[in-house]
Amino acid sequence: EIGVRLVGSEMCIRDSYKLNPDVSDLPDKLAKNINGVKLLVMGTVDTGGSGCVCPEHVMLKAILTNLVFRRDDVVIMDMEAGLEHLGRGTASMMDQFIVVIEPGARSVQTYVRIKELAKDIGVTKVRVVANKIRDESDREFIRSRIPADDLLGFISYSPTVIDADRKGLSPYDCSPDALDEIRAIKAAIDAKE
């Protein structure tokens, strides 16, 4: 167990947590089951200055290890934007990452950095879905910067999807065009396995 963490240059005592907790029963106990798909949601930082989420990441990594290696389940993770989970190796047992980017230089650079960090933790397949595509020039921008083998497809910019998000609705139910594009991306994922 670890009960000490560093804060700046000072040490402080914190609630201890196990590095290898038994989590085999948690997915079945805690998951929401929707049409045969189980959903687990990890919390987030609720208040500024509340400290790191190290215990939560230890728990998440243990749950993922259990699901991937012991159960041989299919796991899809929607990780928060950023690189911290790569530094922690939270998703190191995944077969591949799918990075959602937009047609901009910083977004492409984020993909490049994710690909580098993923390789460091043993994940060699990093695929791309290009989102908020307005026209052919956006598609060409993406194609000129992303290797063809990594590019899964495009999702068009859609006011309908934005309106659905503002209303708290699923774009899945509101935008048949986006749904068709997502189905094409799924077919591309299946074809590249």
Task: Kindly label every feature range from the protein language model.
Residues 45-47, 81-82, 104-106, 133-136, ...:
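Conserved nucleotide-binding/hydrolysis micro-motifs of P-loop NTPases
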Residues 62-71, 86-105:
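Inter-motif core of Ras-like GTPase G domains
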Residues 14-42:
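Alpha-helix-centered segments that form part of catalytic cores
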